[in-house]
Regions:
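Acidic-aromatic substrate-binding/catalytic surfaces of carbohydrate-active enzymes
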Residues: 1-65, 119, 126
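Beta-strand-rich recognition/accessory modules
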Residues: 3, 31, 65-69, 150-228
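Polysaccharide-binding surfaces and accessory modules of carbohydrate-active proteins
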Residues: 80-167, 426
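Catalytic domains of carbohydrate-active enzymes, especially glycoside hydrolases
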Residues: 219, 228-240
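Noncatalytic carbohydrate-binding groove/subsite architecture in carbohydrate-active enzymes
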Residues: 241-326
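Aromatic/acidic polysaccharide-binding cleft in carbohydrate-active enzymes
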Residues: 305-365, 377-379
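Carbohydrate-binding surface patches
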Residues: 379-415
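C-terminal beta-strand-rich structural cap/linker in extracellular carbohydrate-active enzymes
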Residues: 421-435
Length: 435
């Protein structure tokens, strides 16, 4: 964990993740992206990676080479965080060969589950404009051509993000199953040719106001069960039938008139389009309730079915993800079922063939139609454990899911008494509680 005054954050794989201030997430992620003309992501290989950590500040230097079959790009970065709550990310890059690219540069993700409904203001080439992080999934850009973005979180912390070296647009990534809004620098035209030796520089400056320096919290996660959530039930679960046509939500959201009168609306959930890391995959199921709420606006009264559900890569080429066969796949599947239940989805089908995941889905399928209770999960930063409480007859079935590859300590509340639990990496803990 790194700190910049009142701001705390995680640094992993050359990225800044889960920036928190004032007890809430203010930015989901900041990273440098290189994608070729087929949207294939050139994953960075770091030759320099130095982190200097102070009590209230930090400094990072990094250098990366990004290559695909056609792309070859190198960049150097300098990241600093000060005790005054100011973060700066500078990046200088150069193309090592001619290649076609869809994206090169800094990207900033803003969590939809923490910022949806909050207002913002942008400043740029078209002057100042007011907007809102949308609650429903936006089919068009959320903001365009800006160099500065300013917003206030629900806890009263003001965040100002200034971008240099390019103008930025912001899209709603929930269209693709990601639980975020993404600010990025669009390239000037489709599939531009990047010439060997061409260089570019970008800088992001992020400052927070109105956030006190909070002490680092305890290492454990606290979980408490609440009351039944109206309309939340475990859906009927099945396996995706061979040959099922995959319709992505973006196609539904951008062609609303074609779906307005349907009696049954089916779309896929596959969050593998953008970032493939473990953190991203565990974040993205929380986008499902917003996607379903939007679908119900598009097709009022229609039965909603999510099918297929998978995290196998489909673009730029289909590929089976090896995490299907691991305990990671089991936790991810249980997490998806939780958010399907919160969304009130009636039916869902999975295209995941790993043994642990299939066992979990068979177990959860037995609870189809059961009500779901509220669970309150409290942790320092982003909670590493998720909870699912199923109202089943005389009692409550509680599932605790460790979404990380590290052991986690949990304190489970029963009134004023807390029971300590230790969860192994990607463990699903099951227990019963009286109503």
């Amino acid at each position: 964990m790194l700190r910049a005054g009142p701001m705390t954050l995680k640094f992993a794989d050359g990225e800044l993740r889960y920036l928190h201030a004032g007890g809430r997430e203010i930015v989901r992620r900041i990273y440098f992206a290189v994608r070729d003309h087929r949207w294939d992501t050139a994953m960075p290989r770091f030759s320099v990676l130095r982190v200097e950590k102070g009590g209230d500040s930090f400094g990072i230097e990094l250098a990366a080479d990004c290559r695909t079959a056609t792309a070859d790009y190198s960049w150097r970065g300098r990241i600093t965080g000060t005790a005054e709550g100011v973060l700066t990310f500078e990046a200088d890059g150069v193309a090592n060969r001619d290649f076609g690219s869809n994206r090169i540069g800094l990207c900033v993700l803003f969590g939809s589950d923490s910022l949806a409904g909050q207002t913002f203001a942008t400043a740029g080439e078209s002057g100042e404009r007011a907007g809102e992080f949308p609650r429903l999934v936006a089919p068009a850009l959320v903001a365009e051509k800006f160099r500065e973005l300013r917003y206030t979180t629900a806890s009263g912390v003001t965040v100002c993000a200034g971008m240099g070296g390019a103008v930025f647009d912001m899209e709603d990534q929930r269209n693709y199953g990601d639980s975020s809004f993404k600010a990025y620098a669009p390239l000037p035209y489709a599939y531009p040719a990047v010439a060997a030796g061409s260089s570019a520089s970008q800088i992001l400056r992020l400052a927070v106001e109105g956030a006190a320096r909070a002490p680092l919290g305890a290492a454990e996660t606290r979980v408490r069960i609440g009351g039944i959530i109206a309309g939340a039930r475990i859906p009927k679960l099945a396996e995706t039938a061979p040959g099922t046509r995959e319709v992505d939500f973006f196609a539904v959201n951008t062609h609303r008139a074609a779906h307005a009168a349907v009696r049954r609306l089916q779309f896929a959930f596959n969050p593998a389009l953008h970032l493939p890391d473990d953190d991203t995959f565990m974040e993205n199921p929380s986008a499902l309730p917003d996607m379903v709420r939007t679908a119900r606006i598009i097709a009022p009264g229609a039965a909603i079915r999510i099918d297929p559900i998978t995290f196998d890569s489909q673009h730029p080429r289909p590929a089976r993800d090896p995490r299907n066969a691991s305990q990671f796949g089991a936790v991810w599947s249980a997490l998806v079922v939780k958010y399907l239940a919160l969304a009130g989805v009636g039916e869902a089908a999975f295209a995941i063939d790993g043994g642990p995941a299939r066992a979990v889905l068979r177990e959860l399928a037995a609870f189809a139609g059961c009500a779901v209770r509220e669970t309150v999960v409290a942790a320092e930063g982003r909670a590493p454990v998720e909870a699912l409480a199923i109202d089943d007859g005389p009692g409550v079935r509680l599932w605790l899911m460790n979404t990380t590859d590290l052991p986690q300590r949990v304190l489970l509340a029963d009134g004023d008494v807390f029971t300590p639990l230790e969860l192994a990496p990607h463990e699903i803990w099951r227990g019963n509680r009286a109503r």
